[in-house]
Design a protein with these regions (language model features):
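Accessory RNA 3′-end/elbow-binding domains used by RNA modification enzymes
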Residues: 1-13, 19-36, 40, 44-47, ...
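RNA pseudouridine synthases
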Residues: 1-176, 180-205, 286
Length: 303
């Protein structure tokens, strides 16, 4: 039986929450613990990187700061949620040249301070902003620094809306970006559709539906940790690291570049034996190389 603990690429469908998606995955895999790479609104679809079991701790290590999206938006009206699922609260009748909207994208490249939507999961004094907003409680959200590294907008006359492709930092609210693009052109904007297409090097084309997930569909740890330098150690060394002992780096110093970054440690293939399950040797954990020693930092005892 394949151990279900691991990293999975999931294509979230529309109409369910991100936590609802996790519930399906936990049921399908028969596990109790799972986490994901960042919330997608119920109306949104696309890539979620899901970690299960003991590997939920890996999420902060494998999720890069850049996420990519595609979607559509309309102008001339705004909802209370800034997307099509909310109630229309404002309209403007003035016509706007589509070319003005298309050219506005360039002004949003780079760093900027973004005001999140009030209907969001941000906590305000211990309560979710969306709960406060729905209870008609007055509150203000702080702006947050975001980075947009790529952004293109194109008018779709057959649908009378605008399509976009976007790469941005984690924590960017696409609904707010659409709002701000519209404001910059003296109109209003509302998100119609949103699909997350990439998280770092992970692509939605590799993902599976939550209902289709099985333990053999988890990605290899070498793929999950492709941004890390890596070394392979014997079972004896792995056991010492699990005990929190520093290990002389010895010949391993020639296998990694000098750096203060953490190094991923795997069990040697011959030591892993039958536990491979067709995947890479098991992850032992992370170390730093300091003054010729391997210092354990975050370890993952073998199942």
């Amino acid at each position: 039986m394949i151990d279900p603990a691991g990293i999975y690429l999931i294509d979230k469908p529309a109409g369910i929450t991100s936590n609802g998606c996790l519930s399906i995955i936990k049921r399908k895999l028969g596990i109790k613990k799972a986490g994901h790479s960042g919330t997608l609104d119920p109306m949104a679809t696309g890539l979620m990187v899901v970690a299960t079991g003991r590997y939920t701790r890996l999420l902060t290590d494998i999720i890069t700061d850049t996420k990519s999206y595609s979607g559509t938006f309309s102008i001339g009206f705004e909802t209370n949620t800034l997307d099509i699922e909310g109630e229309v609260v404002r309209r403007v009748e003035a016509a706007v040249d589509p070319r003005l909207i298309e050219s506005a994208a360039e002004a949003f490249l780079g760093e900027s301070d973004q005001l999140p939507p009030k209907v969001s999961a941000i906590k305000v004094q211990g309560k979710r902003a969306y709960d406060l907003e729905r209870s008609n409680v007055e509150f203000e959200l702080a702006t947050r620094r975001v980075v947009v590294s790529d952004f293109t907008i194109s008018y779709r006359p057959e649908l009378d809306c605008f399509g976009f492709d976007l790469a941005c930092s984690s924590g960017t609210y696409v609904r707010s970006l659409v709002r701000d693009v519209a404001y910059s052109c003296a109109t209003l904007g509302t998100l119609l559709q949103l699909r997350r297409t990439k998280i770092g090097s992970f692509d939605v084309e590799e993902a599976v539906a939550p209902e289709a997930v099985t333990a053999d569909l988890k990605i290899s740890m070498s793929r999950a940790l492709s941004s890390f330098q890596r070394i392979f150690v014997s079972k004896v060394v792995a056991d010492d690291l699990f005990m929190g002992r520093r290990i002389p780096a010895g010949d391993l110093t020639a296998l990694v570049s000098p750096s203060d970054d953490r190094i991923a440690v795997f069990l040697e293939p011959e030591a892993a034996g039958a536990s491979l399950d067709g995947h890479d040797p098991p992850l032992v954990g992370f170390v730093r190389m300091l003054d010729g020693w391997l210092k354990p930092e975050s370890m993952f005892p073998l199942a």
